[in-house]
Structures are given as C-alpha cells and as structure tokens.
Amino acid sequence: MLNNKIVTAVSLACVLAAGQSALASQTTEADKKYSPRANNTQPNNVYWGDSHLHTGLSLDAGLFGNTVSIDDAYRLARGEQINSAKGIPVKLARPLDWLIVTDHSDLMGIATDIQNGTDNILAIPKAKEWHEGFKKGGKAAGEAAFDLIGNFAQMTLPKQLVKEYSPGSAVFNRIWKTIVNAAEEHNEPGLFTAFIGFEWTSVPKGFNLHRNVILRDNADLALKVEPLTTQPPLGSTDPLALYQWLEDYEKNTGGRAFAFSHNGNLSNGWMFPTEGTYAGGTVDKNYVKLRAKWEPHYEITQIKGDGEAHPYLSPEDEFADYETWDVGNLDISQKKQPEMLKGEYAREALKQGLLLEKKLGYNPYKFGFGGATDSHTSLATADEDNFFGKSTSVEPSKDRINHPFVSSDLGAFEGYKLVSSGYTGIWAHENTRGALFDAMERKETYGTTGPRMTVRFFGGWDYNKQDLQANDPAKVGYAKGVPMGGDLVKQKSNKAPSFMVYAMRDPKSAYLDRIQVIKGWLDKSGKLHERVYDVAVSDGRNIDSSGRTKKAVGNTVDLNTATWTNSIGDAQLSTVWTDPDFDKNESAFYYTRVIEIPTPRWVLYDKVRLGAVLPKEAELVGQERAYSSPIWYSAK
C-alpha cells in the first residue's frame, strides 16, 4: 500500500502542474511584449566606417608604391598597428566598425603584377619595359608609372595587356577573388563588417564621374559576377551602363547592390546634370528614374575636397567655403568656370532634384550623405593628427606639403589642399552587412570630416522640447516622425513641421560650435531657394530674429604647438526647431550641419612635428563638421 504522504505529494504536484499549464495557456499578447528590448529593431547604435579605400590592387595606388596588403588594410581598420608602405608605424585612435575596400576595377591588380614581374607581364614587351623601370627604382620607376598612366588615359595600352586585365580573363578573375575572399575572411557579423565592393572609375576627358559599388551579399553571390570596367571593348564610361550592371546583378543573383558617386567638385559640372549628360544623352524620365533607384547615397566629403556647398552658389553661408577645390577637372585639362558649379555640389543637387521631380516625376538627387577617405595607402586614417596622405608618395615627411596632387599648365591642386577626411556614421540595429546596407539604402546615415560626433535628426509635426528630456529621445523621435533620410507628406492643416536634433561631441575631439538646419525649397513659381538657420549654439550666444547668431565661437588654437582647448563651445547641443517659413504647397528638404570649434589642420601638425615650411596660402585651422542626410517634404 502506498504511503499517504507520497500520494499527497504526487497529487499536489499534479495540481500545481495543471495550474501552471492553465496559466501558460492564458498568456496574452500584452504579456509577450513585456520585455521592452525583445524584437526591437530600432537603430540605437551608430557604426563608423570608411566607404572608400584603395590598396595596391588599384592601378594608381600600386604604381605609386602602395605595398600594404588588403589584409593589413582590414587589420588597421579593426584597431591593429601596422606599418605603412614606407615603414612608418600607424594605428587608428579607435577601431572602425566597418570598411569597404573599393579598388579600381580597371586593370585591377596590374600594378603589383608589373612590379613583381609575373609571367604574363614579362610576355608583353611594353609591360616588361615598365617592369624593368620599377625594378631600377628612383627616377626610372617614376617614369614608368607616368608612362603607364598616360597610356591608360589615352587608351593606348597594348591590347593584349588590356585583355589580360579585363573581365573574363583568368587574371581579372583571380584578383576579384582575392578582394572577395579578403572581405569574407575579415567579416565578423556583430563585430566588424567587411563589405564587398569596387570603384567604377569613369573619367571621360578628365571629368570625374566615379562611382563606388557596394554589395549587400556574401561571396557566394559576389563571385557569380565580375566588376564593370570603363575601358572598351567590355567597359563603358556612361553611368547608364553601370545602372544596367546593377540591374543585371540583382536579376541574375538575387542579391542587392547600389552605387554612390563622389567628387562632383572635379567633374566640371557633369556630376549632377539637369539637361544633358556628358555622353550626349538627355536628362529624361528614364535617366532620373534609374539614378534615383541606383544612387541613394553620396560621398559628400573626402580627401579631394568637401562637396557640400560652394560660396559662389551660397553667398550668404559663411561656412560654405570649406576645403574647396576650385582649379579644374580631375587632371586639370579644363579650368573651372562659375557656371559649372551648379552641377558639382550636393546642396545645389538637392535643390535641382526638387525641380526635376516636379518636371519628370522622379528625384534623381534624393540621396543620403556619407564621408570617406579615398585613401590610396590602404590606411583608413581621417584624423588631422594622423594623416597619411592621398598616396604613398605623400606619407608623412616635412617636404610632402610642397608636392602637388595634380598639376598641369592650367594650374595645380596643391599638396596643402588635401583634406584629412572623412568617415560615415550609420544608424543601425546591428553591425552586419544586411543591417548596415539597409540603413545606407534608407539614408539613415551622416558624413563627417573625420570626428565621430553623435548626431540625431528627426522630422515630424508634433515634437516639443519635452521630447528631448525623455529617457529615450530616439524612441520618441521614431514614434512621432521620421529619421534622417525620411519623408514628410503633405498635411491637411497649415501646421509647419518640427525637427528634433541633438549632437554630442566626439569624446576624442573638439567641443561643438553650433547646429544648423539647411533648408532648400521649390516655390510655387518654380524658383529654387535655400536658407541656413542656426538652431542651437554654444556658450549661451543669442540667435536673432533672422535665425542666425552674429557672434563667432572664438578660436583657442595655439599655432606654435598645434593644440587647442575645449574652453569654448559645448559638449552637446540639442533643440526642437519649427520651420518659421513653411508653406505646405512648396516641396522642400532639410538637413543638419554640426560644426566643431576651430582645431588645427594636418598641415599645422606637419609644421610642429616635422618642421615643414608652409606656404603662406596654407590654411592652418579649420572647423570640422558633420552633415546629416536630409529629410524631404513633398507638397504633392
């Protein structure tokens, strides 16, 4: 006979189990949402990276001495110390979260093969001649490099050489696999994202029409294709050919990709056309539709100048003349003329996009912003005190300041004009290829000239200053409106939109001078306008009725020591701003510009550290900045 205590215990256990089962079956939908962070995909983190970096696999980088491997490029980006091509130890102040190595697709890998004297190079007499020049070094190597580049520019390279390094060849396929496999090796979802990409380097007649291509996908899809080139017979310099390549990639692989351009400032007006294209085509409905689809992002700042605005186009903006390159096109074969500027700068392109959308139904210049280095040293360095130059030939030395980047009979891009810039901040919920790509595509990004300040920008109809005091302002931002890159639609009322913006300094950089909102709009008569508003300023300065502060923040830079102090400016700024000039019948865009207090440029560090003798024209001090992607308002 069973013990009564055992029976009782078993019975009690059964009752409890049944009760627990009943309770479990009564779990409601509200219960399932108890944990506030479960299933949350709100972008709470900003991930920093360089979307434009070259290794020695790029023709120009390799010819001018870049021997730093693609693997070392990733190691530096991830925080390791490596040596530059000249043997100088280099390390980033902080690791990056992601990187896109974008080697030029044209003649990819040829420079290293010529220098190494591979069998296929030695079999072609002219290529063997170049190899011998590099082998001798010094003047002979320089002459070989310029002779090769000259033949490339004039399209007079040996046909067999072009064939060897074009899509479909064994050599081209080998180099592409090297690039893809390196990205696969260094990609660690959640820790570091290594995108697969390349640069399509269209430069007809010296007009810079370059685009970088980024793939969302892994090697299994990337290796089903080969990059598009610009050299005939397989390549093309027409962006329409690139759009077709992207279309084919997505159709044939099931993957996703997009392109983004850079350095409109070196295109002599052809980067953002409004009527005709350089190739003789027209800016018609097909063109604007394709460009809107395939180019959702723009590299607004980098080593070859800042591309936000120009004082000729924005004469009332005292911050527009920042790191401006104004001499000519990329090879200075044609001088710059004022009428070209309209097709070169991002702010003007945003404005022209509103007009084209009204005319043709699509806005081809509806892009988000990012920054990049475009370094050809394999070194993704963007800090003023850690500047390793555009190419290996201008790595740190006291004389590099005097070496022009490009020169011709028409002028020169002087060495001191190079810019230690920039990086892209991406708002995403995790550090993976998919999450970062999607954020770039939806334009939830911002570009900086190097510093990693935190910037949030939301637009809606009901923000108030109390929203900034919430324990999670971003949650309120998403709930009541749209983030940077988003769209506001026309309301029935005449209520003006409000914008919640806040910025925090980079903890390793300078305090903030101000936050500005830049607005562009298309009025009812078809005219374009722009206006700059100071919306939050440091040090208790006053913003007057015109929306501007008349008092400068000051300058603490010591020119003798290349130092500054954070005794001016604020560590963070925030506000909720309502457009005082809003008309619901006028389409518009808004973006923020966050400006630091003055700090030394890299040339001043060269003077203090290396004893460089600076030209009197060299700017010693600048105000670094961030540009948020715009928020658009449609009056349709």
Which ranges hold each PLM region?
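Aromatic- and acidic-residue-enriched carbohydrate-binding clefts of CAZyme catalytic domains
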Residues: 125-162
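C-terminal functional module detector
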Residues: 25-70, 74-131, 165-168, 178-190, ...
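Gram-negative bacterial Sec-dependent N-terminal signal peptides
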Residues: 1-23
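Blade-edge beta-strand/turn elements of extracellular beta-propeller
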Residues: 223-225
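Aromatic/His-enriched, Gly/Pro-containing loop or helix-boundary segments
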Residues: 78, 136-141, 231-236
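Cap/lid and interdomain-hinge subdomains that line or gate substrate/regulatory clefts
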Residues: 148-152, 167-175, 208, 230-260
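Long, charge-dense tracts
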Residues: 214-216
